[in-house]
Amino acid sequence: NQIDEKFLFAAEHIIDHAETVLMKKLNEHVLIALTDHIAFAAENIRNGIVIRNKLLREIEALYHEEFSIAQWAVDYLNHTLAIPYTYDEAGYIAIHIHSGHSGQTSNHRSIREVTIVSEIIQLIEKELRIDIHSEQMALNYSRLANHLRLLIQRYHNQQYAVLDEEIIEIVKRKYSGSYAVAKKIRVLLTKQYQMSITSEELGYLVIHIERLRG
């Protein structure tokens, strides 16, 4: 089942553009993965199958530069291949680009990162009864999403946030409602993803959650 050359050429052009913008070389695995992806997406479009990207907002917040390149890529694909790719595809393409310049040989880690952030945000929305994705919360949403991304990266790199013990105790007492939500996040991370987070990380989470109550 050979892939049409037009998809290969398109993927090469997108990678060239990404490397120019990011001023970084992308991993060689990206070419095959991206070619496969845009060919598969084209087949879905031909068959009338619409796949919505439920992680689009998180991908845009976490990988902003890659997402901007991916939006350019969708316009380029629509124009060059005359196939109506949707902006949902920008999310998937951004993941490929991010994985390609962050030393990963597959998308697994990037997708896991975005999924964890999305699940935590859903939990916070449910507990606080708010819509974090609303326009008036855009700045706090972006801060929270990036804080969560760094938390996950610190865990993987075995690095630890530093926060004075006294401050942790004050935060727990003063923001007891947000602390209760942060503890639920810790349970989610432990049960679903086998990630244990420190009391310092928990303290920072409480501060971010409290900011959302604003």
Regions found by a protein language model. Give the residues of each.
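A cross-family "folded-core" feature that marks the main globular domain of proteins
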Residues: 1-214
